[in-house]
From Swiss-Prot:
Keyword set includes Cytoplasm: yes
Swiss-Prot/TrEMBL GO biological process terms: protein transport; vacuolar transport
Annotated protein name in UniProt: Charged multivesicular body protein 1b
Membrane topology value: Peripheral membrane protein
Role summary: Probable peripherally associated component of the endosomal sorting required for transport complex III (ESCRT-III) which is involved in multivesicular bodies (MVBs) formation and sorting of endosomal cargo proteins into MVBs. MVBs contain intraluminal vesicles (ILVs) that are generated by invagination and scission from the limiting membrane of the endosome and mostly are delivered to lysosomes enabling degradation of membrane proteins, such as stimulated growth factor receptors, lysosomal enzymes and lipids.
Coiled coil: 15-42, 178-199
Keyword Translocase: no
One GO cellular component term: cytosol
Keywords assigned by UniProt, alphabetized: Coiled coil, Cytoplasm, Endosome, Membrane, Protein transport, Transport
Family to which the UniProt record says this protein belongs: Belongs to the SNF7 family.
Location in the cell: Cytoplasm, Cytosol; Endosome; Late endosome membrane
Polar residues bias spans: 170-183
Gene3D superfamilies linked: 6.10.140.1230
């Protein structure tokens, strides 16, 4: 097995590993959602909010892993084509030297930078390339939008058949431009609450 074939194998393996990490995040998101329901049932709105933030963070992280998995997979396909056509250049071979440790680290920013180098090599070979995303550092965020948290809390409360009484200051506006969807969601939640009171 040539070093390029070995690196091709590593790329494919990394894509699968990233996909596996996305699945783990999905599982964690479901666990956090179950905890939201329990906290709401006990009337612990603050605890429910923490679990909602965790759930959204896991969801976003999972999406990032999926995106990077697809990107690595696409690069692997291009490497496969280059190997098959015998178009592996010296500069491309140079890029793969740091690949092993980068892929094993599962660090999205480092993998993204490595994919950038690969994609640059393919552009110079006139192999058509399409970047799926900019570096993942822009999308990996530690903060969670409050309207997403509020919507998830309401969604979980509705699924659990409970009324969520959140003390929100009057006239409080959400983060820049509250969406029509969240307003509609609030109206639906209020209607559901009224229907429950009538029963």
């Amino acid at each position: 097995m040539s070093s390029m074939e070995k690196n091709l194998f590593n790329l494919k393996f990394a894509a699968k590993e990233l996909h596996r990490n996305a699945k783990k995040c999905e599982k964690e998101e479901k666990t956090e959602k179950a905890k939201i329901k329990k906290a709401i049932q006990k009337g612990n709105t603050e605890i429910a909010r923490i679990h909602a933030e965790n759930a959204i963070r896991q969801k976003n992280q999972g999406i990032n892993f999926l995106r990077m998995s697809a990107r690595v997979d696409a690069v692997a396909a291009r490497v496969q084509t280059a190997v098959t056509m015998g178009k592996v250049t010296k500069s491309m071979a140079g890029v793969v030297k740091s690949m092993d440790t980068t892929l094993k680290s599962m660090n999205l920013e480092k993998i993204s930078a490595l994919m950038d180098k690969f994609e640059h090599q393919f552009e110079t070979l006139d192999v058509q390339t399409q970047q799926m995303e900019d570096t993942m550092s822009n999308t990996t965020t530690l903060t969670t939008p409050q309207n997403q948290v509020d919507n998830l809390l309401h969604e979980m409360a509705d699924e659990a058949g409970l009324d969520l009484n959140m003390e929100l200051p009057q006239g409080q506006t959400g983060s820049v431009g509250t969406s029509v969807a969240s307003t509609e969601q609030d109206e639906l939640s209020q209607r559901l609450a009224r229907l429950r009171d009538q029963v």
